[in-house]
Amino acid sequence: MKVVIVTSVRSLLDASIQFQKTACRHHCNYLSMQVVKEIEEFGTINEKNLEFDTWKDVIQNDEIDALVFYRVKQISISTGVLYESMMRNRTKPISMYFVRDCLAFDGNPPSFRMTSCNINAYNRSKIKDLIILMNMKTCNKKIIGEFIIDNFGSVDALLSIVNSNVTWVTSVINNSNGRGINIRVSNNKMLTITSFRRFVNKLKMYKTTKCASQLDNLCTEMNKMDIIDKK
């Protein structure tokens, strides 16, 4: 199957393009897809994008079997409407895959289906280690923050992995007592959802802490520049 990867950001401050590409490439490799092209967009995607030559070359090429997006929210219109617009210039059906959402869209009748999501062994191991660290009273925020950056690159990247593998992450959270030892947990669904949300909220706190630290560093550097200019 020949596919085209489509990544996009909404802000110049968003540095997630490379992570999106990596996630999509891993997904394609997992499903034995051949990536023949990668498209980068700024802003959300709609029918107007299809008017550009880059998109025309892809849409009118019946050798392309599918488009691989990072997530559904990249598209600002109905997925069905976008599909119909593409099919006006094609003789062969085209599929759309959404990596983060674990969804695929196959066209007419418009319908989504679940796809298998793969979390690699490295990420499994590091997420387990992270959960253990977060449950240890002797580990401070600095240590955990550095662990996240060293192993996942950013809090956003980690959150993307976690949100794409809710079931597996939740099972690890609920079966660990913080020392790497499995314990019996309740089958209460509400408790399971709460524990996952609590974990995600904790991760977001590290994102806020990191941003605040970066802002402090930036202000310090600007103050130094101001002092030099005055001299």
Curated annotation (Swiss-Prot):
Which residues constitute the signal peptide according to the record?
A: none
Entry keywords, A to Z: Early protein, Host nucleus
Q: What induces it?
A: Expressed in the early phase of the viral replicative cycle.
Choose one Gene Ontology CC annotation of this protein and give it: host cell nucleolus
Give compartment(s).
Answer: Host nucleus, Host nucleolus
The yes or no answer to whether the keyword Nucleus is present is: no
Record carries keyword Iron: no
Q: Please report which protein family the annotation says this sequence is part of.
A: Belongs to the orthopoxvirus OPG058 family.
**What is the name listed in the Swiss-Prot or TrEMBL entry for this protein?**
Protein OPG061
